[in-house]
Swiss-Prot record:
Component of the triterpene saponins (e.g. PPD-type ginsenosides or panaxosides) biosynthetic pathways. Glycosyltransferase that catalyzes the biosynthesis of compound K from protopanaxadiol (PPD). This is UDP-glycosyltransferase 71A27. Pathway: Secondary metabolite biosynthesis; terpenoid biosynthesis. It catalyses: (20S)-protopanaxadiol + UDP-alpha-D-glucose = (20S)-ginsenoside C-K + UDP + H(+). Induction: Induced by methyl jasmonate (MeJA). Keywords: Isoprene biosynthesis, Transferase. One of its GO terms (molecular function) is UDP-glucosyltransferase activity. It comes from Panax ginseng.
Amino acid sequence: MKSELIFLPAPAIGHLVGMVEMAKLFISRHENLSVTVLIAKFYMDTGVDNYNKSLLTNPTPRLTIVNLPETDPQNYMLKPRHAIFPSVIETQKTHVRDIISGMTQSESTRVVGLLADLLFINIMDIANEFNVPTYVYSPAGAGHLGLAFHLQTLNDKKQDVTEFRNSDTELLVPSFANPVPAEVLPSMYVDKEGGYDYLFSLFRRCRESKAIIINTFEELEPYAINSLRMDSMIPPIYPVGPILNLNGDGQNSDEAAVILGWLDDQPPSSVVFLCFGSYGSFQENQVKEIAMGLERSGHRFLWSLRPSIPKGETKLQLKYSNLKEILPVGFLDRTSCVGKVIGWAPQVAVLAHKAVGGFVSHCGWNSILESVWYDMSVATWPMYGEQQLNAFEMVKELGLAVEIEVDYRNEYNKTGFIVRADEIETKIKKLMMDEKNSEIRKKVKEMKEKSRVAMSENGSSYTSLAKLFEKIM
């Protein structure tokens, strides 16, 4: 009898891509296994639609894509940000129940588990109805997972963790070797209006799962992974990464060709690439400071500059209609020979290009793994979510990045804090320093090799996945 796993990713492109690529990895490693991925649509993220179309156009044997019914965006638009994903999964529970019910009644296939994104862990209730074991996928790193469990434990002990916000406190967190400054704690865990109580409820449920699968690898986060394994109150941990989509997300192939063509004309390792994720946008005054810093640095650059969502709109904007309205006067003309400002960017293809020598990143976990895989030095500029913590981990804990900022917050930047052009200039020059003079570049190169060994036969992640199969099957 064939075995079937059901995957339920959260409907954001960074979460979805990781789980689909993981499904492909599972299938490639186990010939008797099939995977069904249930995809919920999210009105804000156009990347989900484009990626979904690419999956349907280029099907993978034994991988089934099931699109859950779309719901009216009006159901979510008036809700606070932290309440959107809970609402999404609530509207889909009936459909998920029907799908699991039908699959468990098959006489030719045995459903061996449900692998749910951590944000959708409450779907465990439905899996339990059909005696289907639930496994959790953590799209962020082991350090972040350990911090979340730690804060949830403090919360359970009646400590008000929201008091850490805007404090000078340093926390001793089991998954970090260094004290963690409160200023880099993810906003959603310490903001009274940020739904922290709901998030901690997810981590409580996570402790009830059969295992936690993390997109990381032993050599990158040894301290954090070991701390999670030492905690008897946390389910077994399986680091199986880096799991990456090295073929891109199916978006804008014509634009990608233009961008890569421009890079083809640049000298090796000469271009600094700036990209801040799907939701990474800046106010006009910060955009101007970045432009001045880039120009003064003297380095060639490729800058993915995206606008925020206009009031009343529901979808992410890929680019500005008129760059001259937001950039300093004459900037585009003065830098036309050395720089290119774009909207959407084919990030993986850019990081893989020989012309790129440095990456100014928002420090989303997928971006960190991609930078390691492609031996790309990073300068940290976190924006939202857990990215401040990721930046701290990269700079202080692992020594793999240059710090522009570790505590910049686009989501709650109500104070109008601005990173000035002179600091940006200095850090870009440090980032692009020649390899012989850069300890960080040497460490990144070593970690690249370790990442590839981890995924190869008998490597740490290869072995971890084999052990996971023993548990699941």
